[in-house]
Amino acid sequence: MQVLPPSSTGGPSRLFIMRPVATTLLMVAILLAGIIGYRALPVSALPEVDYPTIQVVTLYPGASPDVMTSAVTAPLERQFGQMSGLKQMSSQSSGGASVITLQFQLTLPLDVAEQEVQAAINAATNLLPSDLPNPPVYSKVNPADPPIMTLAVTSTAMPMTQVEDMVETRVAQKISQISGVGLVTLSGGQRPAVRVKLNAQAIAALGLTSESVRTAITGANVNSAKGSLDGPSRAVTLSANDQMQSAEEYRQLIIAYQNGAPIRLGDVATVEQGAENSWLGAWANKEQAIVMNVQRQPGANIISTADSIRQMLPQLTESLPKSVKVTVLSDRTTNIRASVDDTQFELMMAIALVVMIIYLFLRNIPATIIPGVAVPLSLIGTFAVMVFLDFSINNLTLMALTIATGFVVDDAIVVIENISRYIEKGEKPLAAALKGAGEIGFTIISLTFSLIAVLIPLLFMGDIVGRLFREFAITLAVAILISAVVSLTLTPMMCARMLSQESLRKQNRFSRASEKMFDRIIAAYGRGLAKVLNHPWLTLSVALSTLLLSVLLWVFIPKGFFPVQDNGIIQGTLQAPQSSSFANMAQRQRQVADVILQDPAVQSLTSFVGVDGTNPSLNSARLQINLKPLDERDDRVQKVIARLQTAVDKVPGVDLFLQPTQDLTIDTQVSRTQYQFTLQATSLDALSTWVPQLMEKLQQLPQLSDVSSDWQDKGLVAYVNVDRDSASRLGISMADVDNALYNAFGQRLISTIYTQANQYRVVLEHNTENTPGLAALDTIRLTSSDGGVVPLSSIAKIEQRFAPLSINHLDQFPVTTISFNVPDNYSLGDAVQAIMDTEKTLNLPVDITTQFQGSTLAFQSALGSTVWLIVAAVVAMYIVLGILYESFIHPITILSTLPTAGVGALLALMIAGSELDVIAIIGIILLIGIVKKNAIMMIDFALAAEREQGMSPREAIYQACLLRFRPILMTTLAALLGALPLMLSTGVGAELRRPLGIGMVGGLIVSQVLTLFTTPVIYLLFDRLALWTKSRFARHEEEA
């Protein structure tokens, strides 16, 4: 007995079937809108989901970390802490630099945050030191976000001071004005200045002090208003030679007289043109350079910003001398474009594979053309909606469209297959189209809305992960909706015009062979299904076993957050002993650079040494390693990192920490490794006690690698212990002592040279070439109240101590960050659990709090909400199906297919060695929407057969399974082949796409095999349950 379809007059499709011209023009309009939308959409790596982040930098040369914390950072933090919408505030106070990073809530516009920051800086101005060279400067930039472009400026004919001056005035300022640029930093620190190096013995012999010399210099170089003369007929502006512009002029400056003879500055000091900060340096490969790092504003489009920079570069470089060379060392957009191109290719491959599988099943060119038109039309039409939603073409939206290829073809296949059946039975194409489309309309609506219901929970995911996948979910939902519209309008209209009995019956050798093969498969399936229906409890036990197995696999599978991408750029931190000087660190850096540049995968290298707000201490260096394109190297980034670390381990006295740059940056601090864990306390003493103990234990854990801490408390300090009573008797104040020390050793900026284009500093210091180390303190002289010169050693003792090289705060409290990587044979979930277990064994005091930061914190949050996300998807689908079927039972039958998908996905991930990360979880959620289609197609026809033909439930579900076997197999294979290019991807960004493809392919294979047998059995069991329940109610009513 065969299932006969219910009669229909076309339903919602009738109007479009009967009006082919209108339908065609409507589809052309969708196509044109999509093409225009595609051309208008921006391109990026991922959806723009950055936290509004602002960095505030204050430089105070010569100040110790303790002074920077108490005098600069703390007053600013108190003002910033009062701002509304502030999510997190972190700060780093090091020698001469304070860097405060402010991260705001996602809902707060960046421009509003900027206004609040400016107001807070203004309020704190009176609380900051009066001799700050410059007020705090803020930038709309996340310091942990890698630069979108790095340029090296070198010259073989000009000193670096002149090169930096030209780059700063002619290049950097222009690039800063480009829309989307948040910050342009010049690493290398070779800003021009006049350096005055005092000869301590010479000024002592003449009875002078550094303070008297400083006063003379500042008084001789001024640039202030002088007024004007306003006569009866003329006005005259007053000017004077109050400015000194060159080192030669300063050299001739008279600073005092002795016995009537002038003492010039050149007599007691070396005066020369030099750099403002001599403890800064940058290199491009092995050549000293000015390295220009361009960072984007949070939320700015990387591609358009980089394109604007490249368009401007030729014009900017033309303004530089020919001896100055500007080289683009890295451009993140190169890999972003390559990744997007690869994803677009995989999308086209998915479309081709899906069309191929359609032809394989339909074995008819006209029947293949119809879904071949429907698929690209649905996908292209999605671009038009994406424009209005402010989306971009990125890896996630393209992945959504690639997966949608398998979804959108399902609707067309179901419609074509149903209409073809009636044509093969002898009905006219138009009548068959009306009947078939009307019969299948409800099924299409059920499939569409139940699938969209699965995506709804993704829209409510919180924080940055939710924002990230909102574009993915909405893009996929839009494609599915357009597909449903196309399948109920264009597809039946084309079937009525293109299909005929002759075209469907026309067969070649391939068609006949494949038809026989499918007949044999269906016959074998029918025999197997009959046996399964005779043993329902055994089949039910298999279904329950898959549920139990999916739970076990979920518990034991390694869990991660986001796949580690190979973007071709490695960020590195070089660490040396805490007492290392600038010269020592620069030498070590050059040794490491030599080793790194020998690696065959490395294309170029930039490195930076010194403290300027980017680097926290003199004993560390920053590196950026640019790898060759992926097709020009043999190994991916993780293997390159392992090889480089092994090579650098042979360089004595340094530790190298490397991490690949990622498109998704959640952290706000530049870290040595990928993951962070913080300890926060009310005092530095508590941290100094517990951090070493925790570090010792964490370094022994096999689940962690490259464990390091930013806690550095062994920096050498020369503590000047002043005898206040003796100083007071001589009329010497502590301010006098501080000023003398600052003049000698602080690279003190004592005066400003103003020009038409820029301002330059006069730097005062002692010449310590002949008196290195602590011996230089013996040369310090002070002026007593009677005008005499007093050696510092006569009123103070020098003690050598240890102190922190930098002081870090998180939300105004002291904090230290422990950074770590995860070895290949462990997952982030293993590492997080190991750290939590280790923390418990230490029994930390209550005044120390711990917390994961950045991507590790996001991982914890995502992991905690994952189960609820899947439950929400299942509940949403149950509600939608219950409404559509007006039944509490049938949705459960449909949802019984879900455990098989979970088992298949988790097994595939484990076999492939992939973690269960956010991308894989999205794949599992999508599987929930896909695999239930099989059950919907079976149950729809079974219910119709029971209702209209009076079949028994067993016969109805048996015939429905045989009748719908071919479209079920076809739609499943279409979805599988749509995901296959993602699973097999090997190009740039493949790490991001592969988990989604692996999970979906594995889930589809297992669910296809099992649900064809378990769904009919569960349908019959629930039918018996419904009958039993009805009989019980009937009996109670009779008794009542």
UniProtKB/Swiss-Prot annotation:
Cell inner membrane in keyword set: yes
Description of how the protein assembles with itself and partners: Part of a tripartite efflux system composed of MdtA, MdtB and MdtC. MdtB forms a heteromultimer with MdtC.
Main location: membrane
GO MF annotation terms: xenobiotic transmembrane transporter activity
Record membrane topology: Multi-pass membrane protein
Chain segments annotated as coiled-coil in the UniProt record: none
Localization terms from the record: Cell inner membrane
Induction: The mdtABC operon is transcriptionally activated by BaeR.
Pfam families: ACR_tran
Transmembrane segments: 16-36, 347-367, 369-389, 396-416, 440-460, 472-492, 537-557, 863-883, 888-908, 911-931, 968-988, 998-1018
Keywords: Cell inner membrane, Cell membrane, Membrane, Transmembrane, Transmembrane helix, Transport
Role played: The MdtABC tripartite complex confers resistance against novobiocin and deoxycholate.
Assigned protein family: Belongs to the resistance-nodulation-cell division (RND) (TC 2.A.6) family. MdtB subfamily.
GO CC annotation: plasma membrane
Superkingdom as given in the UniProt entry: Bacteria
Protein name: Multidrug resistance protein MdtB
InterPro entries registered for this protein in UniProt: AcrB_DN_DC_subdom (IPR027463), Acrflvin-R (IPR001036), Multidrug-R_MdtB (IPR022831)
